[in-house]
Amino acid sequence: MRECISVHVGQAGVQMGNACWELYCLEHGIQPDGQMPSDKTIGGGDDSFNTFFSETGAGKHVPRAIFVDLEPSVIDEVRTGTYRQLFHPEQLISGKEDAANNYARGHYTIGKEIIDQVLDRMRKLADQCTGLQGFLVFHSFGGGTGSGFTSLLMERLSVDYGKKSKLEFAIYPAPQVSTAVVEPYNSILTTHTTLEHSDCAFMVDNEAIYDICRRNLDIERPSYTNLNRLISQIVSSITASLRFDGALNVDLTEFQTNLVPYPRIHFPLATYAPVISAEKAYHEQLSVAEITNACFEPANQMVKCDPRHGKYMACCLLYRGDVVPKDVNAAIAAIKTKRSIQFVDWCPTGFKVGINYQPPTAVPGGDLAKVQRAVCMLSNTTAIAEAWARLDHKFDLMYAKRAFVHWYVGEGMEEGEFSEAREDMAALEKDYEEVGLDSYEGEEDEGEEY
C-alpha cells in the first residue's frame, strides 16, 4: 500500500483538515463515527482508501492524520465537533499557549516543547503503514504556529524520514487582506527554512479564493468555512488518484517528477474548475473542453498572479468523473493552438494527465454544485515569482525600519536569520527569472560561470 500521512498545523491547517476529512468521509461513504457500511472486509483489506484511512479490528476507519496547534481552542472544536469519534484522541495534539503570530515562538520557544510528542505520534502512524509514501502538511505562512512549527517539523521529518516525499498545502498571505501585520516576516522565514525540506508546495491565497467564492458562487461575505470547502475540493482532486482506482493514476512521487524541474522551483499553481453554484449548474452542461479552458483563466487560480506574464514549465491536469481520454486529448490540442499559453522552450510537451472515474462529491448544504466532471490543474509557472516579489517587497518595507523585529529576537532568534532568509528569497526570485529565459540566450555567458 502507498499510505499518506496528513499533518495539519496551526489554526489554518486544522480548519483545512476539518473540511478535507469531512469531504473524504463523504466520498468514501464513511460515517462520522468511522463506520463504513459499504466496506465488507473488516480490519485491513487492500482497498484504495486505505492510503488515507487505517482500519481497526472493529471495522472503524481512522484517518491517518495528526492535528497540531500550540493553543487548544481550534482543536477543541474538533474534539467536540461532528467528527469527534473519527479521530483517535492522541491524534489531536494541542499546547497551552499559542505562538502569537510569532515565527520564533513556533519554531524555537514553544514549538520545541511539543515537537517530540508530535514526532512520537507520527512514528506510531508510520509504523501502521506497510509502504509509507509521504506526508501532506497543511499550514499557513502567516501564523506563528503555521510558519514556525511547520518549519521545525519539516526539518525533523527530513532527518527521520529522509527519502519520503513531503508535500505542503500552504495558505499564502493575500495581497490586500491580512490577518497579521507580521505575515511577511513569518512567510519569508518559513519559506527559507522549509525550502530544502519540502518536495512540492501547493500555495493557496485567501484573497484569490474569496474572489472565486464571490464571483462564481455568489457568496457576498465568504466565511472561512466557504473557503476551506473550496480548498478541500482541490485537495481532494489532487489526492483522488491515491484514494480511488482510475484510468490514469497519479501517485505522490509522480507529481514531483512531473512538476518540479529543479528542486527549488517546487511551487505549482493550483486551478480548479468548475466552481459553480447549484442554481447555475442546473442550467448548463460543462464539457471537458469548457472546464479545461476554465483552468487557464487567471480568475480560477488559487494564487493571485498572471500566468500570461510567465511561462509554463510543466502542467498536470487531473480530471475526475465522466471523462474519456479522447475528449481530454482534443481539449489539450485546442489549448496548445492558443498562443496565450507559453511554455519554456526547454520543455516542449508539458502536459501530464490523470483521469479518475469517481465524480466529485458535493458537501450537503455546501456551496458547490454536484457536477458530473471536474478538473484540477497543477501548473509550474514562472508567474508565481510575482507572488514572491510582492511578499519580499512588504518584508523589505518593514525590515528597513526593523519594525517588530524585537519580538523575534526576544524569543531567541538572531537578526542574521532575517537577512539570511531574505537573501534566500532573492535567490529564489532569481532562480525563477533564469528558468524562464530561453536556453539559447543563456548560452554565451555559460563559460564564465564554471
From Swiss-Prot:
Active-site residues from the entry: 254
Modified sites of kind 5-glutamyl polyglutamate: 444
InterPro entries assigned to the protein according to its UniProt record, in alphabetical order: Alpha_tubulin (IPR002452), Tub_FtsZ_C (IPR008280), Tubulin (IPR000217), Tubulin/FtsZ-like_C (IPR037103), Tubulin/FtsZ_2-layer-sand-dom (IPR018316), Tubulin/FtsZ_GTPase_sf (IPR036525), Tubulin_C (IPR023123), Tubulin_CS (IPR017975)
Alphabetized SMART domains for the sequence: Tubulin, Tubulin_C
Cofactor dependence: Mg(2+)
The entry's keywords: Acetylation, Cytoplasm, Cytoskeleton, GTP-binding, Hydrolase, Isopeptide bond, Magnesium, Metal-binding, Microtubule, Nucleotide-binding
An example Gene Ontology molecular-function term: hydrolase activity
N6-acetyllysine sites (modified residues): 40
Family matches, as SUPFAM superfamilies: Tubulin C-terminal domain-like, Tubulin nucleotide-binding domain-like
Source taxon at top rank: Eukaryota
GO biological process entries: microtubule-based process
One annotated Gene Ontology cellular component of this protein: microtubule
Post-translational modification: Some glutamate residues at the C-terminus are polyglycylated, resulting in polyglycine chains on the gamma-carboxyl group. Glycylation is mainly limited to tubulin incorporated into axonemes (cilia and flagella) whereas glutamylation is prevalent in neuronal cells, centrioles, axonemes, and the mitotic spindle. Both modifications can coexist on the same protein on adjacent residues, and lowering polyglycylation levels increases polyglutamylation, and reciprocally. The precise function of polyglycylation is still unclear. Some glutamate residues at the C-terminus are polyglutamylated, resulting in polyglutamate chains on the gamma-carboxyl group. Polyglutamylation plays a key role in microtubule severing by spastin (SPAST). SPAST preferentially recognizes and acts on microtubules decorated with short polyglutamate tails: severing activity by SPAST increases as the number of glutamates per tubulin rises from one to eight, but decreases beyond this glutamylation threshold.
Transmembrane segments: none
Residues carrying the site annotation Involved in polymerization: 450
Residues involved in Mg(2+) binding: 71
Span of the signal peptide: none
Sequence positions that bind GTP: 11, 71, 140, 144-145, 179, 206, 228
Keyword GTP-binding tagged: yes
Reaction(s) this enzyme catalyzes, per UniProt: GTP + H2O = GDP + phosphate + H(+)
Subcellular location: Cytoplasm, Cytoskeleton
Function: Tubulin is the major constituent of microtubules, a cylinder consisting of laterally associated linear protofilaments composed of alpha- and beta-tubulin heterodimers. Microtubules grow by the addition of GTP-tubulin dimers to the microtubule end, where a stabilizing cap forms. Below the cap, tubulin dimers are in GDP-bound state, owing to GTPase activity of alpha-tubulin.
Family, per entry: Belongs to the tubulin family.
Entry text on domains: The MREC motif may be critical for tubulin autoregulation.
Subunit description: Dimer of alpha and beta chains. A typical microtubule is a hollow water-filled tube with an outer diameter of 25 nm and an inner diameter of 15 nM. Alpha-beta heterodimers associate head-to-tail to form protofilaments running lengthwise along the microtubule wall with the beta-tubulin subunit facing the microtubule plus end conferring a structural polarity. Microtubules usually have 13 protofilaments but different protofilament numbers can be found in some organisms and specialized cells.
Name the record gives this protein: Tubulin alpha chain
Species: Notophthalmus viridescens (Eastern newt)
